[in-house]
Every structure is written in structure tokens, then in C-alpha cells.
Amino acid sequence: AVDAGAKVIHLLADLHGRGADGSFVSDLFKEAHMILIEQGRRETVTLFGGGGIVGADHVPKAIISGLDAAALDLPVLFAFQGRSHGSLRKRDKVSGTLPRRMDHDWAEQRLANLCGSWRDQLLEILGAMGIRDVRRLRGEFGRSMIVRHLEDEAFEGIAGYAGGGA
């Protein structure tokens, strides 16, 4: 896509945060980020990603994994008190419905509240890391704490621990 002149690439996982091969979304984002770095093209392409991003803490994790921006789909639907229907495993099998009578001003305020609270969470995490600009967070893998890695480090060598990605 980059060879064809794409300036934005939208990476999409299922709504549980899994790629087509079952890989977790943060691994997929990191892989795309690293490929672009290896090609010397990272600064020419915007990585936009979605899938499994449902909590305020998921946005900074997605950015640490290499994204420039995160797509929000289900959180917006639910902020409007909408309902999802179908399988969340397959994007083409899920749909959403909004309340029949939704006041425009109310919906606008709900979206502002959602974005504001997620912004506050991002600023809190940036502050805790001593970072003032969200762009500095992109691809900072060394700052991330991945549960799988932490468990392996803590429990490796203990009889009965099934870790190691098992």
C-alpha cells in the first residue's frame, strides 16, 4: 500500500482485539510500525488502528504499540446507549442500533464526555511517564508493561506455571 502512495493505513482487528491469524492487536500494531521503520517510511505514513479498543487505557497502549491514532467504534455506540447485535468476532457480522429518540444535544454531550475522559486518562499516563507530547509515546515499547511478559518474568521456573505464551 505504501508503494502505491498510501499516506494512511487503517489496521483493523476484530472487536475482541484479534487479527485474522489470532494475534493480539498490540502485536499487529507493533509489527506494522516496525516494518515501516525498517523500510525507512515510518514518518511518511499514519497508522490508524482499531479493534478491541474499548477502555480509556487501551488508547495509550495502542499508541505505545506504534499507532498514530486509535479508532473507536463500540465505545461510541455504547456511549449513545446503543446496542450491538451479532458476533463480535467477525466485523461483517456485527451491527449496531441507536435509541429511536436520541436528542442531538444529549448525544453531542455524551460524545464530548467520552472523549474528554479518555483524553484525561491519556494525559494522566503521559504525566506518569514524564512525557509532555503524545507523539513521543508512539512506539515506546520499552515503557509498556505487557502482562504476558510480566508473568513470564515473575513465574518462570515455578513448577506448574504454564507460561511462555501458552
Regions found by a protein language model. Give the residues of each.
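Glycine-rich phosphate/ribose-binding loops and adjacent secondary-structure elements
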Residues: A1-E108
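C-terminal extensions of enzymes
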Residues: W106-A166
